[in-house]
């Protein structure tokens, strides 16, 4: 005799009576879990309501993007002191002490300036809670930043680290992809579209964000003299950047791309956006040496060593950058200048181990998720650092090196549970396999 089934939700029994029909379906996975047709109808209705509300939210978000986005007040509740900002950078960026100081002070002054502007605005609105009697109503200029340093020296990382710490949106763009309006490529305004996307389409938040433009040296003119030919991605782009860097109202299409006369636009005021431009500036050291040397003819000048190039880059002046190919107007809008040194072998070893997000710590955590201990021998770490220096990719190239020799071991990682994987120098050079040691038996596995 079959047992009577009960619905796990309404607790009512199954009934085959045509007048009080209630058919119950039992789960194939768990026979103790049952549901009746009435409860299924109720759940279907609730899910339909949820889908409709979710669809409404998506439509509302799309409408914001298509029209004028939205504006919601965005203020920094607390502006950390320069020492505190540098301490944050110390956790992630190895070396570059002078650059970290310059960067921390510039970011602090920028957001202190924004805070002062907000207080002045509230004072003008006769807000009794704001007291600025000890301060004069002086207009404070924006302190945009120009970073000079080789690839992988930490330029982008510094900007990303402080933006994350301050919970400020940041947009990172490559200057080499930018072209003048009317030519194939990206318009300069697309940089602001990325910033708006990073701000979740909050215009107020975007207007207090950070824009990082890398490879700024790649859009330089070939000489100080103006070219008679069209300059699609050189001086023309610098002139277009000048408008947004100095602070102006810019109309940008909500979806990026090219502007259309009949399209909708989002208006962004760039006056309070912090612009950070960076580049390697290959060949700048020779320009500086030519200016500083007393040898007029220059025939006996010897080629500079790496250390000499780094030392002379710290002597850079505005005219050197003009000679390199940046227009004076753009340089004038980037008053804070800092030079980063290339990374030494010792610093590269520290980068692998010391930062909070150090690569070795990351890979050890990945292996630990499969209950495998990953050990790097000291000679192996030095060899990884040496390979990165030889490839001239800076710290950016470290991950590719580790991925290369760890690929096979990570492929078989799930079946190595409870083991220890030891990386040797020969393993890094791909002359030997990693040592896999079973903890329980303390011997090398085949």
Curated annotation (Swiss-Prot):
UniProt keyword annotation of Metal-binding present: yes
GO cellular component: HslUV protease complex
Residues that coordinate or bind Zn(2+): 7, 10, 36, 39
Cystine residue pairs: none
Entries under SMART domains matching the protein: AAA (SM00382), ClpB_D2-small (SM01086), zf-C4_ClpX (SM00994)
Residues at which ATP binds: 150-157
Summary of the function given for this chain in its UniProt record: ATP-dependent specificity component of the Clp protease. It directs the protease to specific substrates. Can perform chaperone functions in the absence of ClpP.
Subunit (UniProt): Component of the ClpX-ClpP complex. Forms a hexameric ring that, in the presence of ATP, binds to fourteen ClpP subunits assembled into a disk-like structure with a central cavity, resembling the structure of eukaryotic proteasomes.
Name this protein carries in UniProt: ATP-dependent Clp protease ATP-binding subunit ClpX
Taxonomic placement: Bacteria, Pseudomonadati, Campylobacterota, Epsilonproteobacteria, Campylobacterales
């Amino acid at each position: 005799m079959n047992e009577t089934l009960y619905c796990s939700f309404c607790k009512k029994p199954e009934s085959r009576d045509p007048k009080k029909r209630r058919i119950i379906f039992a789960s194939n996975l768990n026979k103790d879990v049952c549901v009746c047709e009435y409860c299924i109808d109720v759940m279907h209705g609730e899910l339909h309501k949820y889908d409709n509300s979710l669809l409404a939210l998506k439509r509302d978000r799309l409408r914001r993007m298509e029209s004028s986005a939205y504006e919601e007040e965005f203020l920094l509740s607390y502006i950390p002191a320069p020492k505190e900002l540098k301490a944050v950078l110390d956790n992630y960026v190895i070396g570059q002490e002078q650059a970290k100081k310059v960067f921390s002070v510039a970011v602090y002054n920028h957001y202190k300036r924004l805070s002062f502007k907000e207080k002045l605005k509230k004072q003008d609105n006769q807000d009794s809670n704001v007291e600025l009697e000890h301060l004069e109503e002086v207009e404070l200029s924006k302190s945009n930043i120009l970073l000079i340093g080789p690839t992988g020296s930490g330029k982008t990382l510094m900007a990303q680290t402080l933006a994350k710490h301050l919970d400020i949106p940041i947009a990172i763009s490559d200057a080499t992809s930018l072209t003048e309006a009317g030519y194939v490529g990206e318009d300069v305004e697309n940089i602001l579209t990325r910033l708006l996307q990073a701000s979740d389409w909050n215009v107020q938040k975007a207007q207090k964000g950070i824009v990082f433009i890398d490879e700024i040296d790649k859009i330089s003119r070939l000489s100080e003299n103006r070219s008679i030919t069209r300059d699609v991605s050189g001086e023309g782009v610098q002139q277009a950047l000048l408008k947004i860097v100095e602070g102006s109202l810019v109309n940008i299409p909500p979806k990026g791309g090219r502007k259309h006369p009949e399209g909708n636009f989002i208006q962004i005021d760039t006056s309070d956006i912090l612009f950070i431009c960076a580049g390697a500036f290959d060949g700048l050291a020779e320009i500086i040496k030519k200016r500083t040397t007393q040898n007029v003819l220059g025939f006996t000048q010897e080629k500079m060593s790496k250390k000499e190039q780094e030392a002379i880059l710290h002597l850079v002046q505005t005219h050197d950058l003009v000679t390199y190919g940046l227009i004076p107007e753009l340089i004038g809008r980037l008053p804070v200048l800092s030079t980063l040194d290339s990374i030494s072998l010792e610093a590269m070893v520290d980068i692998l181990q010391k930062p909070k997000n150090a690569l070795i710590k990351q890979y050890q955590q990945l292996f630990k998720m499969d209950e495998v201990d990953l050990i790097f021998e000291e000679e192996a770490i030095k060899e990884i650092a040496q390979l990165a220096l030889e490839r001239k990719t800076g710290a950016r190239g470290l991950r590719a090196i580790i991925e290369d020799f760890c690929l096979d071991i990570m492929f078989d990682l799930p079946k190595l549970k409870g083991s220890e994987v030891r990386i040797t120098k020969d393993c890094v050079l791909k002359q030997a396999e990693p040592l896999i040691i079973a903890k329980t038996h303390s011997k090398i596995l085949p």
